[in-house]
Amino acid sequence: MLHMISHGPENGSEAGTPLIIAHGLFGSGRNWGVIAKRLANHRRVIALDMRNHGASPWSEDHSYHALAADIEEVATTLDQPVDLLGHSMGGKAAMVAALSGAPIRRLIVADIAPVGYSHSQQPIIDAMQSVPLDHITNRAEADQALSAHIEDPALRSFLLQSLNVSTQRWRLNLPALSASMDQIIGFPDI
């Protein structure tokens, strides 16, 4: 089961229709914290860590069918149809979940279309894998190492949210994401 961060009422008349949020590539449920809390005034909002991201389980299978099955597993535990918001990679997974019959009432897809793209994110994975984690003692050192490959400080800051400095490891299954890059930038046959 995916790791979930839940906000708002869980049951009762205040609960309303639950909203599940599926983040994009290299993200996590924590990225949606402020928005999720704001939306949780009258409904339960669940921000997921998608597989191979954050605190969720890692798997070699990072296909959109597998990601959609993960979303459906969470949705079915709520015992009612859900609203689903998917961003980028999470948006593609959300589309596949909706088309596969998951109990989804409304679907919101942000910043992605159901098509294949040609721009690979492999250079970002390569940059992250180049960081000498066994020599990193703080986020500033990791940022310095990443800056040799990624010029944009905002992108580096976003990526570094997935670095656990104390364990000297990424909270991302970079080998699986790398091996699945063609699937990630593509869109499956439904």
Give the residues covered by each predicted segment.
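Conserved serine/cysteine hydrolase catalytic core
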Residues: 167-190
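Active-site glycine-rich loops that stabilize anionic/oxyanionic intermediates
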Residues: 24-27, 88
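Active-site loop/oxyanion-hole signature of alpha/beta-hydrolase fold enzymes
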Residues: 5-11, 33-40, 46-85, 89
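Alpha/beta-hydrolase active-site loop signature
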Residues: 26, 50-54, 114
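Flexible "cap/lid" loop of the alpha/beta hydrolase fold
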Residues: 95-99, 103-137
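Helix-loop "lid/cap" segments that line or gate small-molecule binding pockets
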Residues: 127-134, 141-154, 162
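Short beta-strand element of the alpha/beta-hydrolase
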Residues: 15-24
